[in-house]
Amino acid sequence: EEVTEHVNYTGKRFPFFVSVTPEEDHIVFNGFNNYSFSTVFLDANLDFSGVYSGAAFDGGMSAILPLGADKFSLARFSFSDVYMNAGATLSPTAVDIAEGIPSEWKSELDAESPILIKNITINSTEYAAFLATTKSNQLTLMLYQAGSEELAGSKYLGDSVPLKACDFSITEDGGLMILTQATVMSSFNRIATIKLSKEELESLVQ
């Protein structure tokens, strides 16, 4: 029933994803395993390697970015709460629960909205960039140096029009283009973009 509601946009939206480790020795995907929303690791032969199981339909990973050497930047949810760890250590051969991964509670974030994590480079330094939606319908961009759990910089976006995070990418001129869903006049959902210049990005991590 939950999967049908996800497909038909009539219920909870689950953060399905597929990724691969930098060493290309494991595939990581979010899906259902033993009736729980789980993060599953497959080895290079596509055989089961390990799993971090969620709490049925109410907990699990929201997003994950493999950094290499068993390090991951991740966000996870538990009911209406969101937790983040930009430098978590996960074993691809573990059989464990997602809620047991040490993470920082982010009380302001909306667990029902997408969370995106990508590698970006600013001034030749790599960062794990988290883009999420707050419960007050703003966007928040958080930057961590690759593998570090210490916040390097952050920025809130949107204070008059409700926004929801959709995607983001570095532009050719070194800026950041953010794709978002904007709710106009409290009723109409529209696609919108927000551009941060190269200089604005650099100022976040100075």
Question: At which residue positions do the language-model features occur?
Answer:
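A short beta-strand motif characteristic of beta-propeller blades
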Residues: 2-9, 48-55, 97-109, 150-158
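Repeated scaffold domains used in trafficking and secretory/extracellular systems
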Residues: 6-20, 56-69, 109-121, 162-170
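Hydrophobic strand positions within the blades of repeat-based beta-sheet folds
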Residues: 28-29, 39, 74, 129-131, ...
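Short glycine/acidic-enriched loop and turn motifs that connect beta-strands
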Residues: 32-37, 78-83, 133-138, 183-187
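A short loop-to-beta-strand structural motif that recurs across blades of beta-propeller domains
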Residues: 36-41, 84-89, 138-142, 189-195
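Short loop/turn segments that connect beta-strands within beta-propeller blades
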Residues: 42-47, 91-94, 144-149, 197-199
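Loop/turn-rich, solvent-exposed surfaces of beta-rich toroidal or solenoidal domains
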Residues: 106-148
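Blade-level signature of beta-propeller repeat domains, shared across WD40, Kelch, NHL, RCC1
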Residues: 165-206
